[in-house]
Amino acid sequence: MVPEDLLYTAEHEWIRSTGDGTVTFGITHYAQDALGDIVYVDLPRVGQVLSAGAPCGEVESTKSVSEIFAPVSGEVVAVNVALTDSPETVNTAPYGDGWMVEVRLTGEGSPTLDSAAYRGLI
């Protein structure tokens, strides 16, 4: 499951442009499947400045704890607070209701892959 309209990173994050200088990102279906049942998500705070490629949160599953890496540089303008009470949404809808962070871009992002290149990676 690799939607065509998104960009991806080698660290298994997806990126969706909202067209107004912001992007939304989360982890891919491949990542959530590898993690297993997600039980906790730690996200950056609104107003925090992220640097592309740097850790910005964590996802805890029944198998392990994995870092979330910022795929872009910018200021966090929103986080998915619904994941606090329902972290399993990342498992059931990683590209929809399981989104994690919205960022106002201020700089370059990590190298990205289109859907075909990401499918080749996984």
Go through each PLM region and give its residues.
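Acidic, low-complexity mobile loops and tails
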Residues: 1-55, 88, 92-122
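Short, solvent-exposed beta-edge and connector elements
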Residues: 35-40, 62, 71-73
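Residue-level recognition of beta-strand microenvironments
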Residues: 15-18, 62, 79-82
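Charged, alpha-helix-enriched surfaces in structured cytosolic catalytic cores
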Residues: 71, 85, 113
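Short, charged beta-turn/beta-strand-edge "cap" motif at the junction between a beta-strand
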Residues: 56-57, 62-63, 82-83, 107
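Short, Lys/Arg- and Gly-enriched loop/turn segments at beta-strand edges
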Residues: 60-69, 86-89
